[in-house]
Amino acid sequence: MAEKVVVIYSGGMDSFTVLNRAKKDGKEVFALSFDYGQRHVKELECASIVCKELAVNHKVIDISAINQLLAGSSLTDDIDIPEGHYEAESMKSTVVPNRNMILLSLAVAYAVSVGAEQVYYGAHSGDHAIYPDCRPEFVEKMNDVCKIANYESVEIFSPYLSVDKTAILADGIKMGLDYSNTWTCYNGREKACGKCGSCQERLEAFEENNATDPIPYE
């Protein structure tokens, strides 16, 4: 019997690769997506399409009510999405307070309920400079907590924690993945803007892999 794992699946290219890596490794995947009031809700549409295509158990949980507690992020509030590379100081406005701790806590609870021993999520080195909850020390401390928070121990596993988006895409290309149903742009428009830090990092990853990004841009 295949080992069960929960994959936090946003619908973006990183978590899409993580999802497929888990399947490639023979895991029985329980995909978990969250609507936390993000303006780039199109990523959830992509997640739904992919999970149907892969016949993966998929839950989308509406936790948008927590927006009342998470003010100050351009991803959820009426604040302009900054343009430019992730290293820019302005990109800190895209931090959603305590987001990954909240999502991981819910994913761990789900893992316990379905008998999964691991929760996969797509943190990578390109996020370390801006997002504290994507750094190795955060994953380490969360794992310490997850060992004692329940009777059942659950491991948080970030397969790409030490590599960047370019390396993630390279692994996806090796797996033969099609990224046309992934969404990265932080703006909630019909086409990707190509200007926000998230878009720029994605475009750089495709360029560095000598590959063409299949999604439409403005």
Swiss-Prot record:
Q: Which GO terms describe its molecular function?
A: ATP binding; ligase activity, forming carbon-nitrogen bonds; zinc ion binding
- Looking at the record's lineage, which domain of life comes first? Bacteria
Note the Pfam families from the entry. QueC (PF06508)
Q: In which pathway does it act?
A: Purine metabolism; 7-cyano-7-deazaguanine biosynthesis
* Record keywords: ATP-binding, Ligase, Metal-binding, Nucleotide-binding, Queuosine biosynthesis, Zinc
Q: Which family does it belong to?
A: Belongs to the QueC family.
Q: What does this protein do?
A: Catalyzes the ATP-dependent conversion of 7-carboxy-7-deazaguanine (CDG) to 7-cyano-7-deazaguanine (preQ(0)).
Q: What is this protein called?
A: 7-cyano-7-deazaguanine synthase 1
Give the species this sequence originates from. Answer: Colwellia psychrerythraea (strain 34H / ATCC BAA-681) (Vibrio psychroerythus)
Gene from which the chain derives: queC1
